[in-house]
């Protein structure tokens, strides 16, 4: 009887052992973490390609996450590359992402969007200016590095400036947003993956984007200044200018681009010729010698509860 029990136990053990591989195969995903990667790292090791293995320090190389892709998830099956046994360099993988790649941007982006397509920030990629100009994800993003420079505020702008050279120049002017200081990033105003706003703005309009930080300019005011409601870029260049407050040009020249000349508020100040000054926009050339400009009186440019955006205490102007 004892011998019979031992034989039955042995048969049961062998039966389970025989069925285990097939059952595991049925439960195991086709492309689990590091499946097939061992083949890649047999050549692309620390001695041959140390920079490639830095991906292990990123989300793309987190073994504990079942969503983590394998090499072939991005580079394709690449059978010719993997199975090559010749003395020369093997053929390239099916999908490559380097600066010299001949793979179309659309094919490279498709590899990324296999995972990154359910994010609201990327919902407007199709038809965006970057997509229609064949910008690839890897034109901006670096995958095989411990930290992607475009995600870090301190280094993001340098990535953008590789293409947007005019904005780099403007950002070096005296009046600018603090990108160079690392306090802001291009993505604070722009969504590089596409948006419904102009110039890839994060909001639906320029003013709505600006108001996310400059709420005090929004109002409501009894008397609003129309450009503030329409487009901040009418007066400002957000990337940088040589004029205070990032104005495109200084008052009164900026004001005169929309507003015509008018009489001084105190005729007693008038002592010059009665022709409108081309410099000040006033019917009084003496204002120039007083160091006045439009904003000396109309100080509440963005909106005011006073007529014409006048200073709440105009008597201070003439002390």
Predicted regions mapped to residue ranges:
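Bacterial N-terminal signal peptides
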Residues: 8-19
């Amino acid at each position: 009887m004892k011998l019979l029990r031992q034989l039955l136990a042995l048969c049961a053990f062998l039966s389970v052992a025989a069925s285990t591989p097939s059952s595991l195969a049925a439960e195991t995903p086709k492309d689990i973490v590091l499946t097939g990667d061992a083949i890649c790292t047999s050549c692309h090791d620390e001695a041959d390609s140390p920079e490639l293995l830095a991906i292990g320090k990123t989300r793309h190389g987190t073994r504990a996450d079942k969503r983590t892709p394998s090499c072939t998830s991005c580079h394709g099956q690449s059978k010719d590359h993997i199975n090559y046994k010749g003395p020369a360099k093997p053929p390239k993988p099916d999908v490559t992402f380097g600066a010299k790649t001949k793979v179309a941007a659309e094919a490279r982006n498709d590899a990324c969007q296999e995972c990154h397509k359910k994010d609201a920030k990327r919902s407007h990629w199709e038809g965006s200016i970057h997509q229609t100009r064949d910008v690839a994800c890897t034109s901006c993003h670096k995958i095989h590095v411990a930290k992607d420079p475009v995600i870090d505020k301190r280094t993001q702008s340098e990535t953008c400036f590789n293409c947007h050279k005019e904005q780099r120049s403007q950002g070096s002017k005296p009046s600018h947003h603090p990108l160079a200081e690392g306090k802001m990033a291009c993505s604070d105003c722009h969504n590089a993956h596409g948006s419904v706003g102009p110039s890839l703005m994060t909001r639906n309009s320029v003013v709505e984007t600006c108001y996310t930080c400059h709420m005090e300019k929004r109002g409501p005011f009894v008397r609003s200044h129309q450009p503030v409601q329409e487009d901040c870029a009418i007066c400002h260049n957000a990337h940088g200018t040589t004029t205070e407050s990032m104005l495109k040009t200084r008052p009164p020249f900026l004001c005169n681009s929309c507003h015509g000349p008018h009489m001084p508020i105190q005729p007693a100040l008038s002592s010059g010729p009665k022709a409108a000054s081309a410099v000040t926009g006033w019917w009084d050339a003496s204002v120039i010698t007083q160091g006045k400009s439009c904003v000396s009186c109309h100080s509440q440019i963005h909106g005011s509860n006073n007529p014409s955006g006048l200073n709440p205490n105009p008597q201070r102007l003439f002390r």
